[in-house]
Amino acid sequence: MSLPFDGAISKFHTDAAPQDVRDAIAEDPKGPILTDYPYDDRMKRSDYEDQLAALQIELVKLQAHVKATGTRIAVVFEGRDAAGKGGTIKRFRENLNPRVARVVALSKPSDKEASQWYFQRYIAHLPAGGEIALFDRSWYNRGVVEHVFGFCTPEQRAHFFTQVPEFEQMIVDEGITLVKLWLNVGRAEQLRRFLERERDPLKQWKLSWIDVEGLNRWDAYTAAIDETLSTSHSATAPWTVVRSDDKRRARLAAIRAVLAQVDYAGKDHAVVATPDPAICGGPEIWNA
């Protein structure tokens, strides 16, 4: 089976990736690459599975509370490409009722949507009473990817930054619990994951030309992310950053971060606990 995009990711790896990135991948091609991570080794599978099972029971309790009380929860999943957003969302909802917990993953705007107020197409997908909406990417496309690739003007982006605090304030004032998660991953581990996807026929669908083109724009992404997080972090709608080089630890931290936002009957505080502060915190840890 041929490689997607004519093997462009492999070509970047061999011809254009920084030497330290290539060295890290050569040293640990199966990963995860944890060179700058707070832990030297991936979390043991048995420990991960035990904690995940207990946390998924807590998510079921949360779902029952949401349905019974009409609570509305919106969780925004953002992050670097290949940071594990989709896998984390999967672990959130795999034991939940899809009528209660639904994923919102919008494609690029249509011509009609592009002519509307920027936030308009997202409003229709906010949760109704008794729903949890999981946004696999969100309105923050304008702050990062649209800026990096020139899909919006500087004026449009500046207008977005002016409006996003007010938009999120309205969401919260309406009674919706808003949780914003930023999943981050190091450059070597990101490229290793891309190479893995490129070679695996079952994962190739995850790749896009944005992923390929973005490989050469790491620094531009870094600057855009830094500005976006610092500008849109607020007491009303704070960012929770999860360092996701170890997917197992990251998934557990993300689930705990959401469960911490809602009180529900039968909550097991020993299980929910506090997200691991070594990998989960505010914007100050995003590029640590």
Label each residue range with its predicted role:
Residues M1-A288:
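Glycine-rich phosphate-binding loop of ATP-dependent small-molecule kinases
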